[in-house]
Amino acid sequence: MSEKQVKYPWWYGGAAGIFAVMNTHPLDLTKVRLQAAPIPKPTIVQMLRSILKNEGIVGLYAGLSASLLRQCTYTTARFGMYDALKEHVIPRDKLTNMWYLLGASMVSGALGGLAGNFADLINIRMQNDSALPLDKRRNYKNAIDGMVKIYKAEGAKSLFLTGWKPNMVRGVLMTASQVVTYDMFKNFLVTKYNMDPKKNSTHLTSSLLAGFVATTVCSPADVIKTIVMNAHKKPGHNHDSSFKILMEAINKEGPSFMFRGWVPSFTRLAPFTMLIFFAMEQLKKYRVGMPKEEA
C-alpha cells in the first residue's frame, strides 16, 4: 500500500502509546495486582473494589509516571525499530509477507524490551506497592524517585537488568503478536472483505483481533516478568532465575498459572491495542510533525 512508502517520524509509536496508557492505566494496574496476588486469587471485580475501597480513585493511577516513562522507552523503541526495518531492510514486495514481518518484529521487540526494562521494573513495583504490607512497601514518589532509590539500594545492574530476560521475551512476543497480527488482519480485511484501509472501523477491528492474539501469546512471559520484578531483593543477592520461578509456580498451581490474570490482561490489552493503533493511524493520516512537503 502506498502509505508504507511514506517515512513517518520515529516517535509516533511512543506518542500513540502515551495516549493509550492514559486511558487504560487502571486496567493495567489491576492486571499487575492480580498477577502478583497469592492464592486464592481474587476476581477482577473484587480487585477493583479492593483498590477503590482502600486507596480511592487515586489508587487506580498508582505508577502512572512510570507507565508514561515505559511508553517513552519501550513502545517508542519497538515501534520505531519495526518501522525502520520495514523501510530500510524488508524488500518492498515483501511488506505483507508474514515471515519478514515476524523477523522484523522479533528484533524490534527484543530491543524495545531491553530499552524499557528499567521503566517496566519501576512501573510494576509502583503499581503493586499499595498491595504489600507496610514494612515491605518501597514508596517510590514517581518514576525518577524510583530510579534513584533502586540505584542506591540495589545498584545499576539491578535497575537495568532485573527481569530483563522475561521482559525481552515478552517484548518479542508482544511485538510479533500485536504489531504483525495488526498488519496481517488489516491486510486481510482490506483484500478479502474490501474494507477501506483508511476507515476507523478497519483499524479498530484489526486491533481488537490483534489484542486477543497478543494477550494469549504474551500471558506466560507477562506473569513471570511481574513476579520477578516485584520480588524484594537484598543487597548482594540475586533474584531467583525465571526458570526457577516458572518451575515453582507450575508445581504449586499447575500450567494454568501461565494464564493467571488473562481476563484483566485482555480487558486492558484489547482497548490499549485499539487505542494505540487508532492513534497511530490518526498521526499518519494527518502527518503530525512532518514537513509540509511530505504531508
From Swiss-Prot:
Sorted alphabetically, the Gene Ontology BP terms of this entry are: phosphate ion transport
User: What transmembrane ranges does the database entry give?
Assistant: 8-24, 63-82, 98-122, 163-182, 204-224, 262-280
Q: Where are the Solcar repeats?
A: 4-88, 96-188, 198-286
Q: Which domain of life is it from?
A: Eukaryota
The record's SUPFAM superfamilies line, in alphabetical order, gives:
Mitochondrial carrier (SSF103506)
**What InterPro entries does UniProt report for this protein, alphabetically?**
Mito_Metabolite_Transporter, Mitochondrial_sb/sol_carrier, Mt_carrier_dom_sf
Q: Report keywords, A-Z.
A: Antiport, Membrane, Mitochondrion, Mitochondrion inner membrane, Phosphate transport, Repeat, Transmembrane, Transmembrane helix, Transport
Q: Does the keyword Transmembrane helix apply?
A: yes
The function of this protein is: Mitochondrial dicarboxylic transporter catalyzing the exchange of dicarboxylic acids like malate and succinate for inorganic phosphate. Required for growth on ethanol and acetate.
The entry's protein name is: Mitochondrial dicarboxylate transporter
